[in-house]
Amino acid sequence: MTVRRAEEKDIPKILDLLVQVDMVHHNARPDIFKGPATKYNADELRVILKNEETPVFVCTDDNSIPLGHAFCIHKQITYNSVLTDIRTLYIDDICVDDSARGKHIGKKLFNYVKAYAKSMGVYNITLNVWSCNETAMKFYEAMGLLPQKTGMELIL
């Protein structure tokens, strides 16, 4: 298995992975997530893949077929009256194909993202995770992430 930057040829598989992510959330919260859907279409992915501020990494099998992806976004807080000036690498989306789970692909992807973030000199890695996605929460905790803030809701 190899981790590399995603390329245009990976878009069909990335779209499939995005549907898998959506369905995890839809199955847990059908009141919020439509399912089956993707957060980006192929044209949007082409733009994202070309942008150095939004690197996407894939972990591929021996045939260069993506088994998982990690969408990242470089963020920087500057000139804020309350917050310090820091650079953050935000993980917008991370997924391992249903058929490839249990093979440590998620760990390999996360460790690659972590090494990339260090090489870019960012202060931290951040992400959001839905509380209904307990598997993801456990994975992120195992990777060393700690809660930074909590979003809450009251359904009326």
Where are each of the predicted segments found?
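A short beta-loop-alpha structural element at the N-terminal edge
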Residues: 2-17
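Conserved beta-strand in the GNAT
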Residues: 58, 65-74, 95
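Conserved acetyl-CoA-binding loop of GNAT-fold acetyltransferases
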Residues: 5, 122, 141-150
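Conserved acetyl-CoA binding element of GNAT-fold acetyltransferases
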Residues: 84-98, 153
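Conserved beta-strand-loop-alpha-helix junction that forms the acyl-donor binding cleft
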Residues: 126-136, 153-156
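Conserved glycine-rich acetyl-CoA-binding loop
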Residues: 65, 93, 97-111, 118-120, ...
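A short helix-loop-beta-strand connector motif used in the catalytic cores of GNAT acetyltransferases and
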Residues: 43-58
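Conserved GNAT-fold acetyl-CoA-binding loop/helix
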Residues: 23-45
